[in-house]
Regions:
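Short acidic, glycine-rich surface-loop motifs adjacent to enzyme active sites
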Residues: 194-211
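N-terminal active-site segment of His-dependent metallophosphoesterases
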Residues: 12-88, 210
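Conserved acidic residues
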Residues: 68, 75, 197-199, 234
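N-terminal export leaders
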Residues: 1-9
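Active-site flanking residues adjacent to catalytic metal/cofactor-binding acidic residues
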Residues: 41-42, 74-75, 158, 203, ...
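Extended active-site neighborhood of metal-dependent phosphoesterases/phosphodiesterases
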Residues: 78-195, 214-235, 241-289
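A short C-terminal boundary segment appended to hydrolase-like catalytic domains
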Residues: 31, 274-312
């Protein structure tokens, strides 16, 4: 059985449709029967555009929910990525912003188009300098065991940038050198060989969005939609659009956009597949149990804007 339900804050002004190459092995040590993590994207702006406020609320939330790790959906450093592991942006946009002890946990990141305007290798190498930056591949996967159960969760992080034809035409650094066929083959092999109950995929580009990127993601959607459906990916998290969304088109997969870690942009509300969409600074908290995924959207003031549960 696969179903979901959702709620949102009564005073929240937003749109809502009601409906009747490397695997990292890791075991979770929590005893409450859940894995919990935060999802934030499009954040690296020296603390501006409420980035620091979002970071502070992330710290409070991570502390109260005992978060295990943070997921970044990309565009980690504006406007042109970082140049080296000694780039000042590491301090100004990351180390001096996400300062709460509760955020000194693993950060699993993917890369966005703005990251590609710098040197991706600098972000891949930062793991050598930081204990919490846990990304040294452009795309990768790991499994986590759900405490007090025999079930596992598969997390897959994609590099969606080379699948975006508009970026290739703009000649973003390194993109033309990427082998999209190899990455897609790896994705299919990883999904098809998995025995995990839950499958979560993360990438920068959304497959579905009602934000400013609407209509621009057809290349990415055509590359991954059939794969997600065939192998029953439960949820796909993206950024790129600077807002917070839950899209549920026909099919198996739920699509979330968490790209509001700093600057935000407008989002439209005219699609029947849109379960939630808001232009507000914030992030998502996800609690994953054996039979349920509970997701909460929280803004930069700590207000819960939306909740949804996927039961499996």
């Amino acid at each position: 059985m696969f179903c979901y339900c959702c709620t949102l804050a009564p005073s929240c002004s937003l749109f809502y449709h009601s409906t009747s190459e490397e695997k990292i092995e890791d075991k979770n040590s929590k005893e409450d029967g859940s894995i919990s993590f935060l999802v934030v994207g499009d954040w690296g702006r020296n603390g501006k555009f409420h980035q620091k406020d979002v970071a502070d609320q992330m710290g409070l939330n991570a502390d109260s929910t005992h978060c295990d790790f943070v997921i970044s959906t990309g565009d980690n450093f504006y406007v042109k990525g970082v140049r080296s592991i000694r780039d000042r942006k590491w301090k100004k946009s990351f180390e001096n912003i996400y300062t709460a002890n509760s955020l000194h946990i693993p950060w699993f990141v993917c890369f966005g188009n703005h990251d590609y305007q710098g040197r991706i290798n600098a972000q891949l190498k930062y793991e050598r300098k930081s204990k919490r930056w846990k990304t040294n591949k452009r795309y990768y996967s790991f499994e986590k065991e759900i405490p007090n159960s025999m079930e596992k969760v598969l997390f897959i992080f994609l590099d969606t940038n080379p699948f975006d034809g508009t970026l290739i035409r703009r000649k973003h650094s390194d993109l033309s050198k990427q082998d999209t066929l190899a990455q897609k083959k790896w994705l299919i092999e990883t999904l098809s060989s998995s025995t995990c109950k839950w499958k979560i995929v993360v990438g920068h580009h959304p497959l579905y969005t009602t934000g400013m990127r609407r209509g621009q993601m057809l290349d990415v959607r055509q590359s991954f939609l059939s794969v997600f459906e065939k192998y029953q990916v439960d949820a796909y998290f993206a950024g790129h659009d600077h807002d917070l969304q839950h899209q549920k088109p026909k099919g198996f997969t739920h699509y979330f956009v968490s790209g509001a870690g700093s600057e935000i942009r407008s989002v439209s509300h005219d699609s029947l597949q849109t379960k939630f969409a808001v232009s507000d600074h914030g992030f998502m908290n996800v609690e994953l149990k054996k039979d349920a995924l509970n997701l909460t959207v929280i803004n930069y003031l700590g207000k819960e804007l939306y909740k949804t549960t996927i039961i499996k």
